[in-house]
Regions:
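DUTPase catalytic domain/fold
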Residues: 1-147
Length: 147
C-alpha cells in the first residue's frame, strides 16, 4: 500500500475515506466554513472546498469522480464529469458540483460530495506524421461498431 501526503487546510477538513476494503474511490467531503450549508440551484454549479491539498505520487493523477448514489438519487455530479488533480499541484482541491435536477439541492459541511481515485498515466510526446497505420475499423466513427 502506498502513502499519499495530505495537508489539512481548513478547520473541519476530513481525510478521504474508502467505503469498503475493496473500494477504488476515496470519499471527498465538503469543508464549509463554520458548519455552513450551500444551496445549489437547479442546473447550476457550485465550487465546494474540501480543505485538502495533496502530494500525489509522481506518475499518477487524482481523478475526481461522481459518487454513484449522489448522482443517481440527487442529480449531483462533478461539473467536468472527471476532475484531474495533477501530481505537481499543491493547492486546495475543490469539487465543482453540478445539480442536474430541477430542484434545489443542499450540501452541508461534512457531506460526501465526490470520490478520489488515484490512477497511473503514461507520459508521452506527440509525433506528427503524414500517415497512420491501417486498422480494420479505419475511419468508422460514432456508432460504426454497434451492430
Amino acid at each position: 500500500m502506498s502513502n499519499v501526503s495530505i495537508k489539512l487546510l481548513r478547520e473541519g477538513a476530513k481525510l478521504p475515506v474508502r467505503g469498503s476494503a475493496f473500494a477504488a474511490g476515496y470519499d471527498l467531503y465538503a469543508c464549509l466554513d463554520g458548519d455552513k450549508e450551500l444551496i445549489i440551484p437547479p442546473h447550476a454549479t457550485a465550487m465546494l472546498p474540501t480543505g485538502l491539498s495533496f502530494a500525489l505520487p509522481e506518475g499518477t493523477f487524482g481523478a475526481v469522480v461522481a459518487r454513484s448514489g449522489l448522482a443517481s438519487k440527487q442529480g449531483l455530479r462533478p461539473a467536468n464529469c472527471l476532475g484531474v488533480i495533477d501530481s505537481d499541484y499543491r493547492g486546495e482541491c475543490f469539487v465543482a458540483l453540478h445539480n442536474d435536477s430541477n430542484e434545489e439541492r443542499t450540501v452541508r459541511h461534512g457531506d460526501r460530495v465526490a470520490q478520489l481515485v488515484l490512477l497511473p498515466f503514461l507520459p508521452m510526446e506527440f509525433e506528427q506524421v503524414n500517415t497512420l497505420p491501417e486498422t480494420v475499423r479505419g475511419e468508422g466513427g460514432f456508432g460504426s461498431t454497434g451492430r
